[in-house]
Amino acid sequence: MKTWEKNIRRVEPYVPGEQPKVKDVVKLNTNENPYPPTPKVHEAAERMNISDLRLYPDPEVTDLVHAIAAYYGMNDNQVFVGVGSDDVLSMCFLTFFNSDKPILFPNISYSFYSVWADLYRIPYEKQPLDKDFNIIPEDYYKGNGGVVFPNPNAPTALYMELDKVEDIIKHNQDVVVIVDEAYIDFGGKSAMELVNKYENVLVVQTFSKSRSMAGMRIGYCFGNPELIKALNDVKFSFNSYTMNRTSISYGIESVNDKEYFEECVGKIVKTRENAKERLSQLGFSFPDSKANFIFATHKSVPAKEIFEKLKEKNIFVRYFNQPLIDNYLRITIGTDEQMEKLYAALEEITGQVK
């Protein structure tokens, strides 16, 4: 082995959901929003002066930060914006998890957590969920170097009540606690109100799910000004211009259109509740989803078999080939039309064609 090969930092990378190259598919595998962004984004695109692209964007993302802060009733210095919530979370890991003690997160959770920990050489311990896939707050009361968990959790879609979230924070006031709320808009109460109560809390959200902007890559978090300043210091040490002009412009229009946002979320929640009934009738069981997806297992047909047969029909869902969840499928909530195609295919695959 060459000397330079020995010095390569090797990690097991995160594996994203498949992005089919063909167009005629039912894509229910990456928890994207099935509806387009607010029409105001299209209007912003038409107004954009292409000549301005020769100029660097605002490194402090001032206008978008202000729009987000105003929408949620926070101060500008309590908001950090990044290139998707993955970028925000990665910066959080790098900035705040520098102890010799292990950070704690669930064993069935967002798999990027362990990737970042390995990349940044952060020790970590995965905490088991209970038999029903619930996070056990007491497991996070021990000494640690930080805590991070999604709420609702992914891929289980289970929401943990805010009083339990606060219990975890209360027992960890000497470290930073990150609540990853990528799916919070589809059910449950945000931990955002705890930001002004506890100085060690960061609440991370995204435009990728409820705001139909996965292609723009906009994420953000709320925290006390000292935490936000530390994040910006680290961000500027990597790249001063992380957000491009189009992302900033479209993000502002998206966050300002509350009516359209609530309409889209309402449609997804309605379709999700119908999906619970339809999937149950087809022999599936699942935790009670508060996200824009359902984590389902069938009573007789293996998940991998269903996954493969759906793919043959150009219907894409997510299968996780890992212990404890290898007989589950994560099914994104699509439009009613997409879901009807899914149900028809599942009726055939599970032998329940009427």
Q: Positions of the model-derived regions?
A:
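PLP-dependent aminotransferase class I/II
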Residues: E60, N200-S280, F284-P287
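Conserved PLP-binding catalytic core of the aspartate aminotransferase-like
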Residues: V269, Q281-K313
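Phosphate-binding glycine-rich loop
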Residues: T62-P102, S300
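PLP-dependent enzyme catalytic core of the Aspartate aminotransferase-like
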Residues: D163, K309-R318, Q322-K354
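N-terminal "arm"/small-domain region of PLP-dependent enzymes with the aminotransferase-like
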Residues: M1-L55, G143
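Conserved PLP-anchoring active-site segment centered on the Schiff-base-forming lysine
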Residues: T95-W116
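Active-site phosphate-binding strand-loop segment of PLP-dependent enzymes
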Residues: E125, D130-D185
